[in-house]
Amino acid sequence: MQYGYFDNEKREYIIDNVALPCSWTNYLGVEDMAAFINHTAGGYLFYKTPEYHRISRFRGNGVPMDRPGFYVYIRDNEKKDYHSISWQPVAKDLSKAKYRCRHGLPYTVYESEYDGLASSQTMVIPRGENVLL
């Protein structure tokens, strides 16, 4: 089963099937601030060392998992429905929603389409900055 493909022009790995057998992770940051972020926005952020200067919760075994993570929720008040840009943590039915993850150097982009709404979220740690955008 194919889960994604390389885009040589953009230098990205594109995951278009979120039902992976295990977490596929991207490492963001090159200096003091760093993050491990997987294909469903799970992961954690740390400063210098993940064991002592973590900013988000650290799981020493099994990291990264789908939770904790970096999630953006979108809610439709009229329909009383909501979803997340990444497949987790809401995990909408894949027959009704489309999710895609693009791991690049040094960023990750999450894209979704649900109920007529297309959304995207870009995660990056700019070189020389101690911030996750």
Describe each PLM feature range.
Residues 1-133:
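Anionic coordination/interaction segments
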